[in-house]
Design a protein with these regions (language model features):
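Extracytosolic ligand-binding ectodomains
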Residues: 1-323
Length: 323
């Protein structure tokens, strides 16, 4: 049909399925979802976060302030597989270990075996890489387990996907007190973000809150529009050249695309979830973090990791505490 630009796909499996079509017909897929990295493609612009912008900042915080031992649970597909591998090697490099590594089929709601094992092992930290309804079921079951077992009162659950609409789905009894790594939270205290949230609610309802994926999709539309205007053409080569010269003042902060990898510079944040389905931002990067889809600079999985600086420090960017 002659379409040259498409904004879309959420899961990595869907992205990988359609990429050959974009390659065959020389189109450009604008992919707005965070993902597990280890990919670049001349026919894809990646505007969501990669590992050094989500799982590494979270794990650096956990390893420095909570524990070196991790209980891991995830959905049985590439997102959890790759992040599980990173976390396994990172904890080992820091003298810790994976207490357990468990996987459920996507959509599986039977978390009883996982909860039973958590009762037994009493981990200080649980890395939740479940997605969708499986994740919601886990949070609800864990909240009940924590109420029943005093040894789990201080156990922290971490996630790289937890967002405001999911907190609302989970419910106020189970959604509070969890650690999340994201480049966007709806509570970012800037005028641009406040305007974005207001406009979002006007469009989708008074109680609606945008997620990181909603913000990334919004940013992607603007980046595409700016690149098309700069190129004065839909030709993907000219559009990419124009894109690499532009930036967008997004709700999260300045966003621009790295010409070497076609991934995006994004502002990393950590937050703690609250009962009202929002997050308290507890730390954020001082500047947009360079994307590192192959972990070339972060060296997160090498033997020297335990002595090395954090990935953001290696990029001359540090997390500052937000009070």
């Amino acid at each position: 049909e002659g379409v040259k630009h498409v904004i879309g796909c959420y899961t990595s499996s869907s992205r990988k399925e359609v990429i050959p079509i974009f390659e065959k017909y020389d189109g450009l897929l604008w992919y707005p979802s965070h993902y597990e990295g280890f990919e670049t493609n001349n026919n894809v612009i990646y505007t969501g976060a990669v590992q050094n912008q989500h799982v590494l900042p979270l794990m650096n915080h956990v390893l420095a302030h909570i524990t070196r031992d991790v209980y891991f649970v995830g959905s049985n597909y590439v997102w959890a597989w790759e992040n599980g591998r990173i976390i396994r090697e990172l904890t080992k490099a820091h003298g810790g270990k994976m207490i357990a590594e468990r996987y459920l089929q996507v959509g599986d709601l039977d978390v009883a075996r996982i909860i039973e094992e958590i009762h037994e092992k009493r981990p200080a930290f649980i890395m939740n890489m479940l997605i969708g309804e499986s994740s919601y079921a886990f949070y609800r079951a864990f909240a009940k387990a924590r109420d029943e077992n005093a040894a789990l009162q201080k156990t922290l659950v971490g996630s790289c996907t937890l967002c405001e609409p999911e907190l609302a789905q989970i419910g106020p009894q189970a959604c509070a007190g969890h650690l999340a790594s994201s480049v966007y939270f709806s509570t970012i205290d800037t005028e641009i973000n406040k305007q974005f949230v207001t406009s979002y609610r006007q469009r989708y309802g008074h109680d609606a809150l945008p997620s990181a994926d909603a913000e990334a999709s919004y940013n992607t539309v603007h980046l595409l529009a700016l690149a098309l205007a700069g190129a004065d053409s839909v030709d993907i080569g000219r559009v990419k050249k124009a894109l690499h010269k532009t930036s967008f003042q997004a709700p999260q902060g300045i966003v621009h695309v790295d010409p070497e990898s076609n991934h995006s510079y994004l502002t990393v944040r950590l937050g703690i979830s609250r009962e009202d389905a929002t997050f308290k931002v507890i730390s954020e990067a001082n500047a947009p973090v360079r994307p590192d889809p192959y972990l070339v600079w972060a060296e997160a999985c090498g033997e020297s990791s335990a002595q090395s600086k954090t990935p953001m420090a290696q990029n001359n960017i540090g997390l500052r505490i937000v009070r």
